[in-house]
Every structure is written in C-alpha cells, then in structure tokens.
Regions:
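Conserved catalytic-core motifs of GNAT/GCN5-like acyltransferases
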Residues: 105-107, 117, 122-139
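Short amphipathic alpha-helix that is part of the acyltransferase structural core
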Residues: 1-35, 127, 137-139
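Conserved GNAT acetyl-CoA-binding A-motif
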Residues: 97-110
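A conserved beta-strand-loop-helix scaffold within acyl/acetyltransferase catalytic domains
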Residues: 31-32, 36-76
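Conserved acetyl-CoA-binding loop-helix of GNAT-fold acetyltransferases
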Residues: 78, 84-97
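Residue-level recognition of the GNAT/N-acetyltransferase active site
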Residues: 9, 79, 109
Length: 139
C-alpha cells in the first residue's frame, strides 16, 4: 500500500467521484444516478479535498464555504476498503485548515453519528433542515 496523498480542487473526473460514493456507501444518500446533478454539486462546491492511494480516489470532502465564518461540509466519503486508517480525520483536518477561521458544520448520516465526536465535533441541538420538496409547505 502506498502513502495517501491529499489534494485540494474540484477539477475531478466525475466517474471517479461517483464510483467513490458507491464504494463508500454515501451513494445511498446522493443522486449518483443523475450525472448532471452530481456534476453541478461538484463544480459548485467551494472547497473539495481528496485523498488518493496512488491514482485511486479513496476519499473526498465536498464543502460550501465563505472562508470566514462557516464551512458546510456537505459530503465526507472514504472508500470502505480504506476506512479506519485516519483518512476521514485527515480530510476533515485539511478542510478545516483550508476554510480559514470558519466553523465546520455538517449533517451526519445516521450510521456516522458516533464517528464525529471522535474527530472533534460537538453535537448542535438546534439544527433545522428544509428539503426542496417542502419549501413553503406550512404543514
């Protein structure tokens, strides 16, 4: 196994990104069957950090940031074969570093709730979500 290298930038082969999402289980919660939407998600992210094992994409963080106050970490994915090696922790560290003084905020996948306290996150009790299909719905 070679050393993991890290890069910043969103100029990535979409097929590699989709394949990574599939192999990390994040694909279960992302529109990987909609290439145009996935491309838009990738290109409009203001901060993307990737992890590479030689030429294989093994991890990614995809964030939206103002680089001053808030960085929303939209996606954290690490290939299942490469988990439990500190790659996720390092991707988060590099995302935080690149985000300047911004606070990193995320919504956890249900199966990852126990992970985030181990990498320095504290749970916030008053987060709210408004999905696109509920906008303006008064129910």
């Amino acid at each position: 196994m070679s050393a993991i290298t890290y890069r910043i930038g969103n100029d990535l082969d979409l097929d590699l990104v989709i394949e990574l999402y599939r192999s990390s289980t994040l694909g279960e919660r992302r529109p990987i069957g909609d290439r145009a939407r996935m491309q838009c998600m990738l290109q409009n992210a203001s901060l993307v950090v990737t992890a590479w094992d030689a030429e294989q994409l093994v991890g990614i963080t995809r964030s939206v940031s103002d680089f001053a106050y808030c960085t929303y970490l939209s996606d954290l994915a690490v290939r299942c074969t490469h988990q439990r090696r500190g790659i996720g922790r390092e991707l988060i560290r590099r995302t935080r570093e690149a985000g300047g003084q911004a606070t990193v905020v995320l919504l956890s996948a249900p199966n990852a709730v126990e992970y985030y306290p181990h990498v320095g996150f504290t749970q916030h009790p008053s987060a709210w979500v408004l999905p696109p299909d509920r906008a303006g719905d008064s129910r």
